[in-house]
């Protein structure tokens, strides 16, 4: 039995939840495969790690050098000794340093062939005699000249005492070698390159010398060469910056390197204030994308200018000696690079975003297959749909993320184990909520799964690649503005990448040097705080925008309505039972039956209540101009009243406006003008309530392939607020009425149904819950004659307390089911009446068909003219002729007598006399209407 109390929010949510739960059970293995994707990806990462360990981490080049000191009798090494003395420069980094050696603080000077010089550059470069240039500027030129003179020592200090480092500290020593990542061993000392002693002027006794380097276990002599230093004054810092820039290969047209050793801006330095800016070459830090940064030899530059200023204040001989640099002791180490931390940001960006295409295609699939709208037409509101769908996506995403963290930790990925799990989970939770909101938001822009899938995967892989090769490069670049980093993080893919980058950095540092991973105490020191704020704000903004665009797209409202001087939610111009707005446009001349229908509607509009289920008053639909085409008037002022218990059939050629009318009545589009009411409810104001009392059988079957027929009816029955035994009884009766109950057919998946069975199920869905109004679009399409008759019987039985509007191309179906018919042509209702009335009104003739030998065709024409002078030939081919004979001119008995008499004169192969059919009426009305439209 019907329960016309609308289903509440939680009843609708419960219906959808049960349906989705059943649907997901049938697709359990798809969900399992989705959830275990992180496991396979983590295993892949472990495999890459094993290969990396074999080729890189455990390579002899990445551990302290060793030498065999004792061999066994079989020639195999019995004892190894490892230490600095057996190591190359690369291997030395991994050796134990219980007592790291003190090292000379060296100044970085350009190579001879790249030094900037005011002299004959080509000549001095060929001989290697170009001086080392130091640039200075400042506000006080005289003070600058003094400090410039004090920068380089004019004396040379060197003796063979044990305090050789202190003695060397009096000299300005430099190297062309770049520094390393640590100060355990300096490449400038260990390499074969000489050390340069920068002097204002080189003399024969200071040109070349050597000193012993005795720092256990290393002992060797190091050559020191004198190089001339040249201090040059510039007017301001802009000149220095331009000169340094032009010294880079890309900074000049000749692509020649002109490098200076150091540059100083003394600014407002005076006797009471020491304020200096130092230029240095930051490119020596190495690749900005490398997680380890090399030292740059800035300390010696600072010491030089500081000593020069001290001499200015205190006189010559006053110095702060920079004796040496020395690292802290360390044990022997090995290379411990973890791939999960190295490639973690891009890899896990892809892993987490893999859920996005799944969610987006799921939403677009329901829209493409019209499943969303058919659920809405049967009473499912937007709120319950959003809540249940969002909850499902969130649940599957949480399980996915938890599995990722569990699998990653179980197989030992330090990316997960070294960072606080609570921080990780909250970050992932926020990211997946933002991801779900964006999926809802962008789903409105797609109507096909293929397009949505391609766009989603472009977003997934594009975010990872752009994050790794663009965003990370800019993030680690010191010159890129931080404000632009914040702006880039507004892109969800980059905010996800930034969070994963922070996790990988903390895990990498802990793995490399034993520092702690990311903890809550580090939260404010990292970028995670700003990332959390960005994601939270974007989550709510995207969710609101998604709900807005969904409402706009589903109601056909212009998304920029708020920029116009009109209300998009403007209701119908005339409420049912109240005052009716009079159209300013004159109504064209109409047929009497159509005019009578319009008058009846006008009277109904003045009444407070009627027994009519559907009332349409001057309903119009005009499609706006598009792509240069004029506007299209699909429905032209339709007035129609359908009482309860009546089946109204709509006939018409393609493009007549039937579909546009049905779409307006079912809420798929808004009327341009006019009003329509379903049991007193305005389709513009109260469509959500209207949906609770209507049923729809669309032209194409909208079913879930894995749900059974019974499960379909249970779902839609719950949406009609049927519960308990009433629901079970209604489902059983519906299955029996469409012959889907016996033989276990009701419990088979709909995907295994034949086309006719699916059609019958669609009709049963539209009728369950005894809706007040049912719209059926060609309900018996594709059915065999027996099934068609059975279905018609079910529909006829259901219309006792239901108003049905039915569209069909089958005249037999229209005559059997419909109490009244309306023929639609060019958006207008051309005639209204029951089938017998229409045939009597528009079919006032008989059709005589006669087949004879071709030579007797003239005899047949003469025969017909004798019977009816106004008869018209409507068909003629190969001896077969058809004539339309007006009924008022002839009696059937006269035709029979004339034919029997004619048989005596010529041979008649076959003949027949038929009354006008409904199809003849339809064709006649359609042709007449189209002809009048052409000449109007």
Swiss-Prot record:
Bilayer-spanning residue ranges: 34-54, 340-360, 393-413, 422-442, 454-474, 484-501, 527-547
Pfam families (alphabetical): ABC2_membrane_3 (PF12698), ABC_tran (PF00005), ABCA12_C (PF24526)
SMART domains for this protein: AAA (SM00382)
Alphabetical list of InterPro entries matching this protein: AAA+_ATPase, ABC2_TM, ABC_transporter-like_ATP-bd, ABC_transporter-like_CS, ABCA, P-loop_NTPase
Entry keywords, A to Z: ATP-binding, Membrane, Nucleotide-binding, Transmembrane, Transmembrane helix, Transport
Domain named ABC transporter: residues: 614-851
SUPFAM superfamilies cross-referenced by the UniProt entry: P-loop containing nucleoside triphosphate hydrolases
Keyword Transmembrane: yes
Subcellular location: Membrane
Top-level taxon of the source organism: Eukaryota
Family of this protein: Belongs to the ABC transporter superfamily. ABCA family. CPR flippase (TC 3.A.1.211) subfamily.
Record membrane topology: Multi-pass membrane protein
PROSITE patterns according to UniProt: ABC_TRANSPORTER_1 (PS00211), ABC_TRANSPORTER_2 (PS50893)
Name used for this protein in its record: ABC transporter A family member 5
GO molecular function: ABC-type transporter activity; ATP binding; ATP hydrolysis activity
GO CC list: membrane
Residues bound to ATP: 652-659
